[in-house]
Each structure stands twice: as C-alpha cells, then as structure tokens.
Amino acid sequence: MAEQTLKEKTAKGLFWGGLSNGVQQVLNLVFGLMLARILDASDYGMVGMLAIFSAIASTIQESGFTAALTNQKEIRHEDYNAVFWFSTLTGVSFYLILFFCAPLIAQFYDKPELIGLSRIVFLSFLFGGFGIASNAYMFKTLMVKERAKIDIISLICSGTIGVLLALNGFAYYGLAIQTTAYIGIGSMLKFCYSPWTPTFLIDWRPLKSMFRFSSKLIVTNVFTQISNNIFSVILGKFYSPRQLGFYSQGQKWMGMGNSFVGGMINGVAQPVLVQSVADKDRQRNMFRKMVRFGAFISFPLMFGFAFVAKEFVLIFLGEKWSSSVLFLQIFCCWGAFWYLQSLYTNLLISHGKSDLYLYGVVINSTLQLLFIVCFSYFGIYFMVVGFVIANVIGLLLWHIIINRVVSINLFSVIKDIIPVSYTHLTLPTT
C-alpha cells in the first residue's frame, strides 16, 4: 500500500509539476517576448549586474532549510516556526545591509544608476523571507497542485506589472519591479495557502540540529550561485551592459526550457527519493525512471531549440537581439544534460550527504572558473563554451560521488539516455 501511495504521489506531482511548468513557460514566453520587443539589451544588462548579489543573499536567507526540513522524518510546528522567524529576520537584515551598500556596488560597475535600481531589486529579500517556511511545508507534503496555482498567479500578476511599466518608459526599473513583485506575491500566497501558520512563541533550538545539515548546503549553494553568475560580474565589469544583455537573453531562453523539465522533476525528486532511502534497489529504480523521463523531455526540447534558435530570435525578438543567438545555442547544448546534474544532487541530498554535495560543488565550480579563465583569451563566446565543457565533465564527477553512496552503474545511466540523445542529435541532419 505504501508503494502504491508513493507511486500515486509521484505521478500526481509529475502531472501538476508538468502542467504548472507548461503554463509558466507559455506565460514567460508571452511576457518575455513583449518585454524584449519594448526594451533593449542594455536594460537587461543593468539588472543582470545585480544577479550575483541577489542570488548569494537569497541562498544565505534560505539557508538550506527546505532540504533540511524535507529530510527530517518527524517535524513539529516549532521547526517550521524557527525557520520562518530566522528567514524573516535575515531578509530584513540583508535588505538593510545591501541598501547601504548600493553606492559601493554602483561604484564597482561605474554605473550610478545602479543605486536606485539595486534598492528595488533587493526588496525581494524582504518579501521572500515570509514564504520560505510555508514553501518548505508545501514542498515536503507534496502540495504540488497548490504550488502550481501560486506560481501561475504570481507570474501573471508580476508579468503584467512589468509590461505596463516598460510601456510607460520605466525601462530597466520595469524588469526590477517585475522580479520583486513575483517574489512578493508568491510569498504572500504561500503564506495563505499553507495550512501551517507561524506563532510568536519562538524556539530557536530546532535550528541547531538543522544547521548541522544545512550549513554545508549554504556554502555549497553560495559556490553554485557564484559559478552560475560569474559571467554577469565579468561582462558587467569589463564589457558593456549591452553585451551582458545579449548574454542574459541567451541564458534566459535556455533557462525557460530547463525550467520546464527541472520543474517537473525537482518538484517531486527529493521528497520521493527521501521516502525510498531505506531501500536502495527501489531508489535506484526510481532514479533511473526519472533519468529516462528527463531524457525523453529534455533532449528533444533543448536540441530542437538550439536548431531553431536563429529563427526564434529573429522572428519573435527581432533583429536587435541577433547577437544573443550563439549564446542561446551554446547554452542549449548544456541545457539538454542539466536535469541529470539536478537529479544527482537531489539523490545525494536525500541521503543527507551534504558534505559530499559541498565537495562536488566546490570541485565543479573550480573547474568552471578554470575553463572560463583558460578560454577568456579567445573572447566571450569561447568563455561560455568553456563553461559548458566544464559542466559536462562535472557530470562524471557527480556520478562518481553518487556511486559511492548508492552504487549506480555509469553504463546503466548512459544506456538510459543514449537512445533518446542519439535520436534527437541526428534528427536535424536527416
């Protein structure tokens, strides 16, 4: 009965995750095309310069508590309550710190306009803290349907706000307010939808036990965010906002395709894998099913997107975005395999191996930076190629780490993805 129940939860989660991500991608497509038609590359570049600060602060604010709470077998109200107040107070603290650091950020990039812009973008920390505990509750209990509704409503509201502001000449401020509105509306709805509610009787003791697990996740995720956003810093500092804007657009549209696949799988992967952690054979089978399912969706989507990237950009975004085509094609090559890295890390976290997760991320991030530096002599596009090569090599590293924990044969994983990948790699040439 427990097996059937878990299968039903997984199927339901994949269905609602797929439906939610499908609708979100359509909405992102509509709003993204509208904004790209109205704004130019430098507007996206201005917001992109702040990406690394937002990513690192959000990671520290979340502190790995969602994963820590999901891994706990017995959870009390006090656990969620401690996380709620910690994330809320951390959000307020980060906003105040970054509010006063805004002039220093603007000075680093030599862009005085970033002072006001950053203070709007960083409001997302303030709003985001209110929804972390509620999101963790909904994630652990597989409330995928409710989370889907929240994401869609938040996207519609924030996208409409962004387009209206862009039409009225707010330029990059429209993008900043759109992002902040999305997080704010999402946090409010999670707070309302979640059956759990906070109280003022605060007990900080649960955080101590969670920090033993989550502290490594914090460091890990900070490394991940630095490696993912290092291009934004390099291009913002040494190149123009326009170049950063082209890079951001290429990464953005690839990310939308990735989000469709990753959203379906990540919405259920860790909770489901945690519930089968005691039976490694069963967990291996579930993992391989997710690998095959991900390959079936990811390879045709990402390789197909790379094949039509030029036509997509010229027809839907316009000639002014033609310089983002090659970025998009390069990123799509890595995007086809990205879901595998996500599955590996989810499997590792389900076993509570945050130390091995940290080890893998640090090595992978170091590898990325090494390849970026080595390829930087040849220009921006080669730097992105180096980034992709490093990530593909990193998949082998992740498998070696996972094999120590669960004993998954590398050739089994290759056998799961080769038929699908071969079909879709050769399809454009037939």
Give the residues covered by each predicted segment.
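Interhelical loop/hinge segments that connect adjacent transmembrane helices in multipass membrane
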Residues: 1-6, 10, 145, 188-229, ...
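Alpha-helical transmembrane segments of multi-pass membrane transport and lipid-handling proteins
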Residues: 29, 85-110, 116, 160-164, ...
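Membrane-interface helix-loop junctions in multi-pass transport and translocation proteins
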Residues: 34-51, 103, 107, 115-116, ...
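Conserved small/polar residues in nucleotide/adenosyl-binding loops
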Residues: 423-429
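Signature of the first transmembrane helix
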Residues: 6-65, 86, 90-102, 124, ...
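Membrane-interface junctions at transmembrane-helix termini in multi-pass inner-membrane proteins
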Residues: 68-77, 127-153, 168, 173, ...
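Interfacial transmembrane-helix starts/ends
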Residues: 10-11, 45, 76-89, 118, ...
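Helix-loop junctions and terminal segments of transmembrane helices
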Residues: 59-77, 138-140, 198, 250, ...
